[in-house]
Amino acid sequence: MAYAEVPEFMAALELREGVSARALAFTVLTAARSGETREMRWAEIDFDSRMWIIPAQRMKAAKEHRVPLTDAALNLLAERGNDCDLVFGSDVKPGKPISDMSMTSVLRRMNRNSVTVHGFRSAFRDWAGETTAFPREVIEAALAHRLKDKAEAAYARGDLFDKRRQLMVAWAALITGDKRTNAHLHDA
């Protein structure tokens, strides 16, 4: 899906009920991988610092990843009941995460047959690279991508968290239609 279509999609998704629809919305808001969202635990969320800390063992790069949480993401979490350890636990199998096909099923029910959950990460990447002034390394860090250049990676010890927060606020503003925060779009 092209990034320009994501705001309309998110408005339609907001009308959908169910844990899988909420998980999909959270995944799009955070540009996370679907497995990271499906396995998300309440204990990983630091509400005071407004961040989600994904443990290394659940990350593709095997390195802990801190995800800045926007108002939209926090509001979505506030709507969830924390009756189990998992944020997006299965309604069918209590105590288990939603299935790996559950978010894809939401897309199919919305007649978005050519769209994949992972494609929203591509939409985020395209939007950030084409329409904002955020540096490439901030965008790649938001996607939890490893630096390909080993020499560059050896010196990159920080995670650019504050800059990534600005990026995620701008993304949330775009896809939720929150014009109050669009001032961050080009302030990298």
Language-model features: where?
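DNA-binding alpha-helical recognition surfaces that contact promoter or target DNA
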Residues: E39, W127, A141
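C-terminal secondary-structure termini that scaffold catalytic or DNA-interacting sites
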Residues: Y3, M59-K60, D71-A73, E79-C84, ...
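Basic, Lys/Arg- and aromatic-enriched nucleic-acid-binding interface segment
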Residues: M1-M40, D48, M59-K63, P94, ...
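Short, polar N-cap/turn motifs at the start of nucleic acid-interacting alpha helices
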Residues: E44-M51, S114, A133-A156, G177-A183
